[in-house]
Curated annotation (Swiss-Prot):
One of its GO terms (molecular function) is tRNA binding. It comes from the Archaea. InterPro entries: PsdUridine_synth_cat_dom_sf, Pus10, Pus10-like, Pus10-like_C, Pus10_THUMP_arc. The gene is pus10. HAMAP family: Pus10_arch. The active site is at 268 (nucleophile). This is tRNA pseudouridine synthase Pus10. The keyword RNA-binding applies. The keyword Transcription regulation does not apply. Belongs to the pseudouridine synthase Pus10 family. It catalyses: uridine(54) in tRNA = pseudouridine(54) in tRNA; uridine(55) in tRNA = pseudouridine(55) in tRNA. GO terms for biological process: tRNA pseudouridine synthesis. Its EC number is 5.4.99.25.
Amino acid sequence: MGGSSISTPLDFNKIVEDVEKTLSKYPLCDHCLGRFFAKYGLGLSNRERGSSLKTMLGFKLYDDYSSKRIGRDSLLALAENAGEPLTRMVEKLFAENVNPKTCFICGGRISDEWLDSVAEAVYEKLKEASVTRFVVGVKLGRNLREKELQLVTETGFTRAESLKNEIKREVGKKVMAKYGLVPDFEKPEATAIVKLDENFNYRVELVITPVLLKGVYNKRGRNISHVPWLAKQGGRKYPLSIQEYLESRLADPFKAKKVKIHAAGREDVDARTLGPGRPLVIEIVEPLVRSYDIEDVNKLIRSDLVEVRVHKPASRRDIELLKQTSREKRKVYRLLVVSSTPISEAQLNELEAYFNDIAIQQRTPIRILTRKKDVLRVRKVYEVRTKPVSSTSFEALVYCDGGLYVKELVHCDQGRTNPCFASILNTELKPVELDVLYIEH
């Protein structure tokens, strides 16, 4: 027998004593009593479990009364708190009617009929939103939570199930059995939240899982913001945003409340995004239509000014990864730079040689200090390539870390970026155009 372990057998006498002790103080219906012993037995509902426990207690109490270990008054009090089958036993013993007390937890309101009505209300909400895969959530009123906690604390039961869990499970099972909808704990289309007050009045609210689409976007024009940008005076600062554009194309087909975007960083509003594009996730909020074909979606969002291409469905994890890794992804920028003095080809060669695998120290740019903390960050520039445009202007391709403020790399930002192009060329420089050519995926 070496190495094998033998589980401790159930002490049925102890279980019945616990039931008696509990019912001597609290009136409990079958559902609520069974729930406090939920981890005993297999394949039983809490109602069946509670009824069985009361039957077992009835055997003990009849024997105790016959052996004069319990008196009439104590037996009557237990019958009042337990209800059937103890009330029937007492009525036969004493030829006296017993009026059972209402359940301390639910007031006797939990029943198969009540659960059926909740399941029907949940189904109606799911049907309105064309949801077939769902989960049930429960929010209890404070008074109910306190009662449940009081009883568990006083009894010390360790094999109990919460009221929330019972309602979630039983309602989910009934919706599946009666209406054919499938509980899906991995990828639910919606969560039906049953909100209960202390009188077990309920209402059902539906939290619809958004449709998430993974793709990339290109901005072919300038002065296009990520999200609507309002001026301090209340008017629009820029006429178009990527989020509004997508909402205008997708909200109606999906019958959605709104559309949001999550991108791997963001370029300046006056910058274009060319090349393979910037990764993003489109979040379609509270859609009543969930089925879609990716090719049809791409046709809806096709445009010359803002080009968005959806590749596949996304998850919340995809959004997290976009946010977490955007600073790690290297980028290539194209800048058109204007100088206050003539720039020679030799100076441009010097610039290329200097900005080769070099660390750049940047404080938060002055232009965004009103909305971001003033911190020092270090980013690397791996390579710079230049091409003269005129005697006082040139193009620069910059290959660098994500998170580098590339405009400030040009003009130094009053010494807050070091080193910078202006300090090496010893002249005043201004970036007049910026394009994002490549973002590491």
